[in-house]
Amino acid sequence: MKSLITPITAGLLLALSQPLLAATDTGGYAATAGGNVTGAVSKTATSMQDIVNIIDAARLDANGKKVKGGAYPLVITYTGNEDSLINAAAANICGQWSKDPRGVEIKEFTKGITIIGANGSSANFGIWIKKSSDVVVQNMRIGYLPGGAKDGDMIRVDDSPNVWVDHNELFAANHECDGTPDNDTTFESAVDIKGASNTVTVSYNYIHGVKKVGLDGSSSSDTGRNITYHHNYYNDVNARLPLQRGGLVHAYNNLYTNITGSGLNVRQNGQALIENNWFEKAINPVTSRYDGKNFGTWVLKGNNITKPADFSTYSITWTADTKPYVNADSWTSTGTFPTVAYNYSPVSAQCVKDKLPGYAGVGKNLATLTSTACK
């Protein structure tokens, strides 16, 4: 089989060996520099196990005593390459879901931690954040994870406030194999956020070939987070962009293309501000469905679609559900949204279409899209 890994130029093969200057402005609800703060210890990991070992060591003081929340802030640069595992999984899609998941767990670590992939690195394992805070995950290329039937998420944020998921590439196959539990678990989610994971920012990620992109809440009783999704590029994905259960979602400057099931699904009385995005070739791009009640509401502002007459121009279609549902097929706002509690400067939807693919994902030196680039 032809390799799925695109050759990388010599310039991009330079590892991100030094942490960037600390920054707490994520363009969203999260305000964190992760581990990149005063007193941070920087380490390099060449494998998944190295990351595990480095985090374990950071839990202990100089005397080997465990410190609650971690002994020191931590910046880990991951230089490993698992292209061979990714390509093998891509060649045997239906052989992955029943395997055990692979992942790094960041549990009860509140001192601050950043995991940043070196350019040219890749991972066939997930990053699972639980009961932690001030965590940043950047420039990680994660794909075709095993364990779809065993909660094998690429990135999972569980009971963890102040998390920033930024400039990653997350990918699998938008396909369902026969015989999987619930007929829905060939691969698990790209980014699931649940529990007490308030103030999270998901930005500049390139997410493609994923059936279930991401939860905002694990059940109808798991509600109430504030999450920002901005400058993400979604292509050939099925649904959950996100599946929002309650709380607030601010989605701005995202590019949604080739959406095969549904896009932003605002449920359980959630409120969404959907601003300056570009939608094309999308089924049910904004909807509230599957619960049959407690429909969420949205404010539509500055998107490329402004009226139903635009649907044919951008290949937007709508479907019904067996339960009561609400689609944005009149393309009007259905509610209100509170004043956004952070500074942000969205570019136009047209600029998102034209420029965002050059900024989202890995190997972009964490560059951000500004109005200057739109001229």
From Swiss-Prot:
One of its GO terms (cellular component) is extracellular region. Disulfide bonds join C94-C177, C351-C374. One of its GO terms (molecular function) is pectate lyase activity. Gene3D superfamilies: Single-stranded right-handed beta-helix, Pectin lyase-like. It catalyses: Eliminative cleavage of (1->4)-alpha-D-galacturonan to give oligosaccharides with 4-deoxy-alpha-D-galact-4-enuronosyl groups at their non-reducing ends. Ca(2+) binds at D151, D153, E188, D192. The keyword Cell inner membrane does not apply. InterPro entries: Pec_lyase, Pectin_lyas_fold, Pectin_lyase_fold/virulence, PEL. It is found in: Secreted. Keywords: Calcium, Disulfide bond, Lyase, Metal-binding, Secreted, Signal, Virulence. One of its GO terms (biological process) is pectin catabolic process. Coiled coil: none annotated. Its main location: secreted. Pathway: Glycan metabolism; pectin degradation; 2-dehydro-3-deoxy-D-gluconate from pectin: step 2/5. Residues 1-22 form the signal peptide. The active site is at R240. Involved in maceration and soft-rotting of plant tissue. Belongs to the polysaccharide lyase 1 family. PLADES subfamily. This is Pectate lyase C. It comes from Dickeya chrysanthemi (Pectobacterium chrysanthemi).
